[in-house]
Amino acid sequence: MSEKKTTHFGFQQVPVEEKAQRVAEVFHSVAAKYDLMNDLMSGGIHRLWKRFTIEASGVRTGHKVLDIAGGTGDLSYQFARLVGSSGQVILADINASMLGVGRDRLIDRGIAGNIAFTQCDAQYLPFPDNTFDCITIAFGLRNVTDKDLALRAMQRVLKPGGRLLVLEFSKPHNELLSKAYDTYSFRILPFMGKLVTNDADSYRYLAESIRMHPDQQTLKGMMDDAGFVNTEFHNMTGGIVALHKGIKP
């Protein structure tokens, strides 16, 4: 009998088919207070990281944009304003709770007409080849079971010349910063999660999933292998976060 394939869920090894369900449980739990926790955890700096991503996207009027793991809609809101009535934004998320919060939030902010909402898995994108001018995935790739499969799916649905932007936690390049970040992640984050959402475990998983995510150079290589060209990354906040960019040839 062959052994079951496993993958990491934080620091744990779990069967491949189990990871998606366990990640789903995390985000069902935190969806209602996701935005509040983002502000508390980052001191609001996540807004600057996302603004840099928007500015690097090259998105303009008439473009079609796919915001994968779009969650509560921070990027989709800005993209919808940029593409105008002649463009379209699709906010995609595998998690129904996060998608529901994002839909309600964007409707409340007056975004309608040029935005659609799709529940789907980043590994199996339900869109035709060569559909999008730009694809973003912000703080979502580390939760995907097969990252290589997802990157190939993104490459497939981009138009030639289209741009992928991956905004994700990464590896600080300063040893002192790295140690301080570890202390913050493993001691303070779970405490904040317990205090605000009554769920320390989900934020412990967050810290662990960040440590298990590929570093900057490794992710760049994965994007190269998926068929992207001109791949590059920009470190932010000392490498705590990195924005990777790649073009479909």
Curated annotation (Swiss-Prot):
It holds the Pfam family Ubie_methyltran. GO terms for biological process: aerobic respiration; menaquinone biosynthetic process; methylation. InterPro entries: SAM-dependent_MTases_sf, UbiE/COQ5_MeTrFase, UbiE/COQ5_MeTrFase_CS. It catalyses: a 2-demethylmenaquinol + S-adenosyl-L-methionine = a menaquinol + S-adenosyl-L-homocysteine + H(+); a 2-methoxy-6-(all-trans-polyprenyl)benzene-1,4-diol + S-adenosyl-L-methionine = a 5-methoxy-2-methyl-3-(all-trans-polyprenyl)benzene-1,4-diol + S-adenosyl-L-homocysteine + H(+). The keyword Transferase applies. GO terms for molecular function: 2-methoxy-6-polyprenyl-1,4-benzoquinol methyltransferase activity; demethylmenaquinone methyltransferase activity. S-adenosyl-L-methionine binds at residues 72, 93, 121-122. Transmembrane segments: none annotated. Its EC number is 2.1.1.163, 2.1.1.201. Keywords: Menaquinone biosynthesis, Methyltransferase, S-adenosyl-L-methionine, Transferase, Ubiquinone biosynthesis. It is an enzyme of class 2 (transferase). Pathway: Quinol/quinone metabolism; menaquinone biosynthesis; menaquinol from 1,4-dihydroxy-2-naphthoate: step 2/2; Cofactor biosynthesis; ubiquinone biosynthesis. Methyltransferase required for the conversion of demethylmenaquinol (DMKH2) to menaquinol (MKH2) and the conversion of 2-polyprenyl-6-methoxy-1,4-benzoquinol (DDMQH2) to 2-polyprenyl-3-methyl-6-methoxy-1,4-benzoquinol (DMQH2). NCBIfam families: MenG_MenH_UbiE, PRK00216.1-1, PRK00216.1-5. Belongs to the class I-like SAM-binding methyltransferase superfamily. MenG/UbiE family. This is Ubiquinone/menaquinone biosynthesis C-methyltransferase UbiE. It comes from Cellvibrio japonicus (strain Ueda107).
